[in-house]
Amino acid sequence: IKVVNISFGTFNKEGNNKKLIEAVELLWDMGYVIIAAAGNNGPEYGTVSIPGSSKKIITVGALDDNIKMIVNGRITKNYSGRGPTKECVQKPDILAPANGIYSCSNGIKSGYSYVPKSGTSMATPIVSGVICMILGINKEMSNIQCKKLIRNTAIDLKMEGNRQGWGKINPEKMVN
C-alpha cells in the first residue's frame, strides 16, 4: 500500500481532531501518499474539513460544485470546502470532478448496486487513482514528488487560490 484515500472528514468545531491530523501526517512522514477530501461545507473561507486541512497531505476540492446537485441529501451548490486553514495554509490543493460520480450503494433505497453521488468524497478517489497510475509507471516516486507533480501539471482555472488550489488535475500531462 502506497496511497491512502480519505473520502471523509470532520468539522473543525468537533472534539479533539488533533489526533486525526497527527495520524495522517505520521503516515505521510512514513512515505505514504495521503489524499483527503476538502469537505462539502463551503463556500465560506476556512471550511476545509479535517484531515484535509493538514498542510502535508493532498487535499481535493470539487471541480464542478457550481452546478446544483444533491450532496449529503441536500440540494446545494458551491459546497466545496475552501481555505485558508487555521494555520493559514491555502487549501484545497487540487480540483477533480465531483458531480454524478457512480459509486457503490447498499441498494436499500435505490435497489441498485451503483448510484450517482456528488461531493468531494467522489473527487478524492479520482486523484488517488491518478496517483496510483503514476506510481505504476514510476514505483520509486515519493509522496512529495507526487504532490509536486500534481502542482506542476495542474490546469490553472483562474479562480481564487482558496477555491482552486493549483487548479484542475491533469492526468494526461502527469503521464507525459
Regions picked out by a protein language model, each given a short descriptive name:
Residues N12, Q164-N176:
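C-terminal domain-closing interface element
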Residues I1-K56, K86-V89, I108-T124, R163:
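Substrate-binding/access-modulating region of protease and related hydrolase catalytic domains
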Residues V33-I35, T59-V60, L95, Y102:
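Structural detector of well-ordered beta-strand residues that form the stable sheet scaffold
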Residues I57-T59, V89, D93, K168:
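Conserved beta-strand scaffold positions in the cores of enzyme catalytic domains, especially
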